[in-house]
Amino acid sequence: MKVYLATPMNGKPIEEIKQKISDCASILAKTDIDVFNPFLEVTANDNSIDGIVKDKKPIEMLCNSAKHIEECDGVLFIGSKEDLKQSSGCQVEILIAVSYGKDCFIYENGEISRLVELELIWSFEKVKEKLS
């Protein structure tokens, strides 16, 4: 099995991101699980201020990374459920995985849990003016 490692990056210190990924990857190295790490330090440095990642084009950055989910069996989110709620990029990565039948996991406090249910609620409202 190969998993794509997802973790919040925008607004986070580069060293913290590297440490989270390293900690998780070292645990996975003891298993039969291979990892794809989308974090590129060179790119992070180009998009940081004082060592804090500040994506200038977050959607472009996300798309460049998320395309690699295709090569993986699933996505493993590194962080707490609260971290996930606050990370638009990681939410999108998990939604991509679920939508295409891939497994999703969360690595929190040294434990891995599998996502068993994802509920999306779509609600639309008529637009009063014409779209141009």
Task: Indicate residue ranges for each PLM-predicted region.
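Conserved catalytic or regulatory cores that recognize and/or transform ribose-phosphate-containing ligands
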Residues: 1-132
